[in-house]
Amino acid sequence: MTSPALKDPAKTRVIVGMSGGVDSSVSALLLMEQGYQVEGLFMKNWEEDDGTEYCTAREDLADAQAVCDRIGIKLHTANFAAEYWDNVFEHFLEEYKAGRTPNPDILCNREIKFKAFLDYALSLGADLIATGHYVRRRDTGELTELLKGLDPNKDQSYFLHAVGGKEIARTLFPVGELEKPEVRAIAEKHGLATAKKKDSTGICFIGERRFSDFLKQYLPAQPGEIQTTEGEVIGRHHGLMYHTIGQRQGLGIGGLKDAGDEPWYVLHKDLARNVLVVGQGNEHPWLFSRALLASEIFWVNPIDLSSPRRLTAKVRYRQGDQQCTLERTENGYRAMFDEPQRAVTPGQSVVFYDGEVCLGGGVIETAEPWSPRQ
């Protein structure tokens, strides 16, 4: 099977997902320079019902249009808000309701950008899509592999690990071979409106709002006790869903007699008792895990796990590669790490690598403590 990307660029129609940011802007420009037939598409994935625009969608659309006008390409628009609500946001709420800390960007990539957008672009007659993600692809015979982006500070393979190889084969990643300063320099050189635009951070549909204010619109808070590892009650929490493992800020603990000056950290969320367990010190033993379990893993391409396999893994974005052994178990997959892993968080994703190849990953179900808990 020949990858669609290997066709003559002049005969290949590519629709670029235009976010209104500098990365997708430069992606479209580079594809134009490479001779592809390029069009853009701006997708709106969130509908506000209060008349506000926390996602800055209006401003982002204007920026995307300005860039497309500048480089002379057509801009399509599409509304995937219904798909986003059904396939991303409802899952996001269910995870928080269950006491976990989800990452909606990963699900958005799988369900929206590389499914809804890809299908829509193909329906418009596109041969390929392109995005501004900092990843690379490599075609090896019948498979297309997902590789880390060349810029280690911007590599986004962690967020694309749940996208299948067939979808990767339909996608170009023009900025994956570049470093961020190069991308901004290209945008500035060509007078693109997004050249100096700040990178978007945080979750789109929350925007500038306080996370707790947003979440309580959809989920009822269940206040409870804050306890030490010895079971001493030292405060109250407003809801376990507002806290994550390793969190330091916003606990409201202070002025405790004989507690010392070391900061408090979230060590554990006891869902059965609705208790937030905390302890002092950045190196508290309860913060460290030796292994984790994931019930399901999405592989970019099928891999052989008939016996344990030595790989590297990340349990959070921008973490360095961590040596581990991955094996199948009756309950899913178990990754045993060579070194202690700090703040392994159920609901977040563990992503596995073989060198620069992103193999896939899954949602962390549980973490095994590095040392026994009394």
Curated annotation (Swiss-Prot):
Gene3D superfamilies named among the record's database cross-references: Adenine nucleotide alpha hydrolases-like domains, HUPs, Translation factors
Protein name (database record): tRNA-specific 2-thiouridylase MnmA
Active-site annotation: 108, 204
Catalytic activity: S-sulfanyl-L-cysteinyl-[protein] + uridine(34) in tRNA + AH2 + ATP = 2-thiouridine(34) in tRNA + L-cysteinyl-[protein] + A + AMP + diphosphate + H(+)
Domain of life: Bacteria
Chain segments carrying region Interaction with target base in tRNA: 103-105
A cellular-component GO term for this protein: cytoplasm
A single GO molecular function term of this UniProt record: ATP binding
UniProt gene name: mnmA
Site, Interaction with tRNA: residue positions: 133, 348
Membership in a protein family: Belongs to the MnmA/TRMU family.
Pfam families named in the record: tRNA_Me_trans, tRNA_Me_trans_C, tRNA_Me_trans_M
Function: Catalyzes the 2-thiolation of uridine at the wobble position (U34) of tRNA, leading to the formation of s(2)U34.
Enzyme class: transferase
Subcellular location: Cytoplasm
Keywords: ATP-binding, Cytoplasm, Disulfide bond, Nucleotide-binding, RNA-binding, Transferase, tRNA processing, tRNA-binding
E.C. code: 2.8.1.13
Positions of disulphide bridges: 108-204
Stretches the record annotates as Interaction with tRNA: 154-156, 316-317
Residues that bind ATP: 17-24, 43, 132
Biological process, per Gene Ontology: tRNA wobble position uridine thiolation
CDD domains: MnmA_TRMU-like
Matching InterPro entries: MnmA-like, MnmA-like_C, MnmA-like_central, MnmA-like_central_sf, Rossmann-like_a/b/a_fold
Organism of this sequence: Pseudomonas entomophila (strain L48)
